[in-house]
Amino acid sequence: MSITASEARQNLFPLIEQVNEDHAPVHITSRKGNAVLMSEEDFTAWTETVHLLRSPRNARRLLDSIAEAEAGDATEHDLIDPDAERA
């Protein structure tokens, strides 16, 4: 969806609800520059993804791991609970 800054201003609260419900960003156009309105949840996920893929070495490692899992070559492990009492 793409709207003008004036339309965004008039409908800000419904737009905030919309991006949180459908997780589709809203493109806002203006003569002074364009912007995007997205949910905080989506923004956080996006910034985490950018952080993880910023390093070419880490990106390759993650993509290789995904490929292994999709090929059925992954090994399942139990997670260690750091708060569990030690025997």
Swiss-Prot record:
Gene source species: Streptomyces coelicolor (strain ATCC BAA-471 / A3(2) / M145)
Name of the protein this chain belongs to: Antitoxin YefM
Primary role: Antitoxin component of a type II toxin-antitoxin (TA) system. A probable antitoxin for the putative mRNA interferase YeoB.
The protein's assembly and partners: Forms a complex with YoeB which inhibits its toxin activity.
GO MF annotation: an example: DNA-binding transcription factor activity
Family per record: Belongs to the phD/YefM antitoxin family.
Any Pfam family hit: PhdYeFM_antitox
UniProtKB keywords: Toxin-antitoxin system
GO BP annotation list: regulation of DNA-templated transcription
